Amino acid sequence: MDQLEERGHLLTEQINPKSRNLDQLTPLELVDLFNQEDAQTLRAIAQARQELAQAIEITAQALGRGGRLFYVGAGTSGRLGVLDAAECPPTFCTHPDLVQGIIAGGAAALVRSSENLEDRPEDGASAIAQRHIIDKDVVVGISAGGTTPFVHGAIEAAKQRGAKTIAMSCVPIEQVPIIVDIDIRLLTGPEILAGSTRLKAGTVTKMALNILSTGVMVCLGKVYGNRMVDVSVTNRKLHDRALRMLQDLTDLSREEAGFLLERSGRKVKLALLMHWTGLDAQMGQELLNNYHGNLRNAVQGYKTNV
């Protein structure tokens, strides 16, 4: 049998002194303790602000040049990556291939724990090869403890292919050095339930992924102000949201907004451009394409040239 690596020194494996009596707390005391400990996630994000900003910048540049974004992880980390990737098409009307989540064990691991599969670095490397990752792409390796072999295998394979690499972990660099382009450390301390990184580590990872993907989409012109003008109108809730955006930004009535939305093919961004410029759908789409889908730049460019 292979000798097990000692991991007790890792921050995510250490014992939290504030929760030593966890099994003796009342429900209200449990809630209060979680609330106090979860405050560390905000501090962790603040401490990693520079690295997160750099990650947004290089990822937006890569996607702007035709690249793709991949999240790679196992267990909770993998599920969070898949979740964030899955939210991009409905929120920003992106192609499903643009942002992808890779989890050790594949789709089955999303609903049933397959933690034993994270110990195979060759599987991580294989996942990179299967998706034909190239130098235009960005790979984010997510591992709370920073040691997941599946993730390290994927990162090394991505580096060999020339892709930009980002690491996201919850342990100090001196405990687990990782050689990547951007190293994001989200230090939230020991978990309330020792070693259960689905707790603070999972929460702060979700926060960081929210910031990364949303920041990238902002840079790519997928929003106008703070509105998701590239929303995919696929159900009644999103249809209503689209109409309200048009009403708020144009002062049209709900009925008028509905007509405009239909004329645009239910594309909010195009509908706004049509309203503000007087262009039809075809001309409006051509103008948007000329400005790489950035609504604000397209409107300003049109006004400058008329």
UniProtKB/Swiss-Prot annotation:
An example GO biological process term is:
peptidoglycan turnover
Entry keyword set: Carbohydrate metabolism, Lyase
Record flagged with keyword Ribonucleoprotein = no
Pathway named in the protein's UniProt entry? Amino-sugar metabolism; N-acetylmuramate degradation
Record's catalysed reaction(s): N-acetyl-D-muramate 6-phosphate + H2O = N-acetyl-D-glucosamine 6-phosphate + (R)-lactate
This entry's Enzyme Commission designation comes to 4.2.1.126
Q: Is Lyase given among the entry's keywords?
A: yes
Q: Which top-level enzyme class is recorded in the Swiss-Prot or TrEMBL entry?
A: lyase
- InterPro entries per UniProt: Etherase_MurQ, Glucokinase_regulatory_CS, MURQ/GCKR, SIS_dom, SIS_dom_sf
Active-site positions, per UniProt?
87 (proton donor), 118
Question: What GO molecular function annotations does the UniProt record carry, in alphabetical order?
Answer: carbohydrate derivative binding; carbon-oxygen lyase activity; ether hydrolase activity
* Record domain SIS: where: 59-222
Additional info?
A: A lyase-type mechanism (elimination/hydration) is suggested for the cleavage of the lactyl ether bond of MurNAc 6-phosphate, with the formation of an alpha,beta-unsaturated aldehyde intermediate with (E)-stereochemistry, followed by the syn addition of water to give product.
Which NCBIfam families does its entry note?
A: N-acetylmuramic acid 6-phosphate etherase, PRK05441.1, PRK12570.1
What's this protein's family per the entry? Belongs to the GCKR-like family. MurNAc-6-P etherase subfamily.
Subunit note: Homodimer.
What role does this protein play? Answer: Specifically catalyzes the cleavage of the D-lactyl ether substituent of MurNAc 6-phosphate, producing GlcNAc 6-phosphate and D-lactate.
Q: What is this protein called?
A: N-acetylmuramic acid 6-phosphate etherase
Query: Which species does this protein come from?
Result: Rippkaea orientalis (strain PCC 8801 / RF-1)
